[in-house]
Amino acid sequence: MMAPVTKILVPTDFSATADVALEYAKVLAGQLGASLHLLHVFSDPYAPAAYAPEVYARLPPSLRQQAIEQARECLRQRLTANEEEQFRGTYDIVSGLTAKQIVEYADDKGIDLIVMGTHGRRGVAHLLLGSVAEHVVRTAACPVLTVRKPGTQTHEHADQPTTIEKVAC
């Protein structure tokens, strides 16, 4: 039997794709009576994403604090964007490697479902940038719903049925 979904985590990088995932999560939370947990993983905007979290500490403290406060305000605005929506919600900011922090947060808070955006990168872009969503799907203990921005092409032949020959080869 499936456990009830009472806590939904929505990680956000403040992209349009993450905002679409949040809208899905708000609808789910309303239908299920679940609480929303909006999470942003802070990283130094001047350091490449592949760097270790220790590099993030190199950002001058005043600039780092300003960036965190701006992120906190963005989270608050997204959570309270529509006063007619009736759901419980919290938001938080953590620092570190994005996918790892999302999974750890979900474990620590007893999250039942993660709803997150995915950019759907393929090929070289995927190899160079990796996929936070893919890592979360592979390592999270709870189910993960990935959401693409509307109009995103998923595959050049997505509207055609896939035959077993294509899957097997």
Which residues are covered by each model-predicted region?
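Small/aliphatic-rich secondary-structure junction motif
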Residues: M2-R58, P150-T152, P161-C169
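A short acidic, glycine-rich active-site loop
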Residues: A57-E73
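Rossmann-fold cofactor-recognition segment
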Residues: G89-Y91
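Charged docking surfaces used in two-component/phosphorelay signaling
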Residues: I93-Q101
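Glycine-rich phosphate-binding loop signature in dinucleotide/nucleotide-binding domains
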Residues: Y105-I111
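Glycine-rich, Arg-bearing micro-motifs that act as flexible, cationic patches
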Residues: L113-H135, Q153-E156
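Short, structured coil segments at secondary-structure junctions
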Residues: V132, A140-A141
